[in-house]
Amino acid sequence: MKISQAVGNACTVPASSVETHNNNPSKESKIIYLPGTNCEIKSQALLSAFTSYRVGGAAELYVAPRNIEALQASLRYAQEHNLRVTTLGAGSNLLVSDRGISGLVIATRHLRYTHFDHQTGQVTIAAGESIPSLAWEIAKLGWQGFEWAVGIPGTVGGAVVMNAGAHNSCIADILVSAQVLSPDGTVETLTPEELGYAYRTSLLQGSNRVVTQATFQLQPGFDPAYVTATTKQHKQMRLTTQPYNFPSCGSVFRNPKPYSAGWLIEQSGLKGYQIGGAQVAHLHANFIVNRGGAKANDIFCLIRHIQQEVQERWSILLEPEVKMLGEFQAA
C-alpha cells in the first residue's frame, strides 16, 4: 500500500458537501461500513469541493475520520484491500486530475482539537485544524510565534508534511514534535530532525505515514492586542501582494535560490497568460488562478508551459510546489 500525504461520531461523509461522480458508468456509488466503528467509506466522491482550486474528479473511495480509531480502521481497510491511500487536508496545495484518484482518499479535516500548555508555552494541535484560524486564536491569547502563518490556507497536517512557511519563517522553526500513524496502526512521535526538514519538504512527503497531530513551541505572556496587530499586518501584506479573488493553490513553484519564481515568470512575459479557465495571476506571477470553468488539465498544461518558457529563457527548471495527483494529459 502506498500513501500520498498532499493533509465524536467516528467519521462522516457530509451529504451537503460530497457529490458523487461516476467516471465509469459501469461503477455504482456505494457506501462501505467499517466493522467496529461508525465509520463509512463512500465511493465515487467528487473532490473538487475539497480542493482550493475547485477542480478535480472523483475519489474511487473517500472517508473522513473523526478520531484516531476511525483513521486506524480506514488504514486497515486500505491495507487489507491493497488500496493506494491519499491523505487530504484542506486541499490548498493540491491539483487533482479531472480523471480523479484511484484508491482511498482519507480526509483529515475532522480531526480537530487544540491544547494549550500555559506553563511550557507549547500547543498541541490536531491535523485537521485550520492554520489561519489557529493564528488568530493564538494571537488573541497573547502568544507569539505563529503570526506569520495567518495567510497559509491549509491545515496543520499538511503544513507539517510540506514544512509550510511565509515571511522568512516556517513550521520547522517552531515544531517540537509530530505524531504520525503508520499503515499498521503504529503511532510514532517524530522530532524536526527525524522529519528531515528542508525548504518546503520533509521525509513525510511520499511516505506511508499520516500526521495526526503536532506540538509547537510558542512564546506566551505578550499583549494580545500587540500580537493581534502583528498578525493583521502579516495578513494585510498577503492580501495586497497575492490574489484572493479567484480560486488558487497558493504558490505554484518553489523559489530557485537566489531567484523568486514569481519574478522569473513575470520577466518571461507570462503574467495574464491563460489556458482555458486557468490564468497566471496579474497580481503575483507565481499564482495560477481559476478564472471560472477551469479544468485541472488546464492548470496542468499552464504549469508545463511556464516551466518550458522559464527554462528556455533562464535555463532554470521551476519545481512545482503544488502536488499533482492522478493522470494528466499534456497539450
Swiss-Prot record:
User: In the UniProt record, which is one GO cellular component term?
Assistant: cytosol
Which compartment or compartments is the protein found in?
Cytoplasm
Listed under catalytic activity are: UDP-N-acetyl-alpha-D-muramate + NADP(+) = UDP-N-acetyl-3-O-(1-carboxyvinyl)-alpha-D-glucosamine + NADPH + H(+)
Any one Gene Ontology MF annotation carried by this entry is:
FAD binding
Main enzyme class? oxidoreductase
Catalytic site positions: 200, 251, 321
The EC code for this enzyme is 1.3.1.98
On the tree of life, the source organism's domain of life is Bacteria
The main location class comes to cytoplasm
Identify which cofactors the protein needs according to its UniProt entry. Answer: FAD
Q: In which pathway does it act?
A: Cell wall biogenesis; peptidoglycan biosynthesis
Q: Where is the FAD-binding PCMH-type domain?
A: 54-221
Protein family membership: Belongs to the MurB family.
Official protein name in the record:
UDP-N-acetylenolpyruvoylglucosamine reductase
